[in-house]
Amino acid sequence: MKIYTRAGDDGTTGLYFGGRVDKSSDPIEVNGAVDEAQACLGWARSLSETGSPINELLIQLERDLWVLMAEVATLPENRHKLKPEQSLVTQSMIDRLSLEIEMPKEFVVPGENQLSAALDVARTVIRRAERTAVGYAIENSLVVHYLNRLSDLAWTMARWAEGPMHRPARVR
């Protein structure tokens, strides 16, 4: 199988359920930013211990972003891939991890370790994807809501990954 099709040589790309749009169109800009976010989450996952809870969570988040990108690359009448449950799971993970860390009282300087730094990079890329999605105003979709929760989760995961310095004595 060849990786290239030549179909995009004219500056267009195909949508999930048919149709073509310019590669500079809003949905493709959104998906480009989300693709970068997914790659950053993958980088963070590569720095985590294989099989650890954070590693498993990161791979699930990467898979959620596939679903989100399919949602964006679909005509409005076919948007139903991203489910409210995905945002609720993300929110429950924020709540769960928040119990294991002491929330910083000041601004956080990223870079305590490689994993937390990668998660902070992922967070900033996710926030850019969210800003791009807001500008596109995706009708009948949970894309912006999910990206908002995901950026909060990435921030929380980064604080958790910083280690015992941000965890209360009861969980050290």
Regions found by a protein language model. Name each.
Residues 1-172:
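Phosphate/pyrophosphate-binding loop motifs in nucleotide- or prenyl diphosphate-using proteins
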